[in-house]
Regions:
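Short glycine-rich or small-residue beta-strand-to-loop segments that form or flank ligand, phosphate
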Residues: 1-9, 56-58
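Active-site rim loops that border cofactor/substrate pockets in soluble metabolic enzymes
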Residues: 22-50
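Structural motif
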Residues: 30-33, 53-57, 73, 88-90
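C-terminal functional extensions of proteins
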Residues: 61-143
């Protein structure tokens, strides 16, 4: 868990997302580090030091005018220093009813974990669980 650029996002959304996600993962983690002032790559360092097979980082995203509390999730197979963004899967705008729901985000996280384990990779090599999934019109913010 990392506050990233929005501690408010972590405060509001991390626990509900964990509650929705952990039951979907066959062997959930036994250690959840909490990092202040972190950026996405911190998961590579932590995962490498812990000899983790995979990391799932929940991090506060850069606040926008309409979403000061958006949570992001980054999933990386075989974390180590030097991983690139192309080697991670990102799920963004996790905000309950105002963005991606906890349930949908949890299912996407579980999908990416299962696929990463099956294929021994993450990032652009993995496909989205449902490429047709979009937010309802009422949840979209028109430009």
């Amino acid at each position: 868990l990392a506050d990233g650029l929005s501690a408010l996002a972590l405060e509001r959304h991390a626990l509900p997302l964990l509650d929705a996600t952990l039951p979907l993962i066959p062997n959930p983690c036994s250690l959840i580090p909490v990092v202040q002032n972190a950026r996405v790559a911190i998961a590579d360092q932590i995962g490498h030091l812990l000899h983790a097979q995979i990391t799932v980082l929940l991090i506060g995203e850069r606040p926008g005018l309409s979403s000061p509390d958006s949570l992001g999730c980054y999933i990386t197979w075989a974390p180590r220093p030097g991983r690139t963004d192309a080697e991670r899967n990102c799920i963004s705008n996790i905000r309950g009813p105002e963005g991606l729901s906890y349930t949908e985000a949890a299912h996407r996280i579980a999908h990416y974990i299962a696929e990463a384990q099956r294929l021994n990779t993450s990032g652009i090599a993995l496909k989205d669980p449902d490429p047709t999934l979009t937010l309802p019109i009422s949840a979209r913010n028109p430009l």
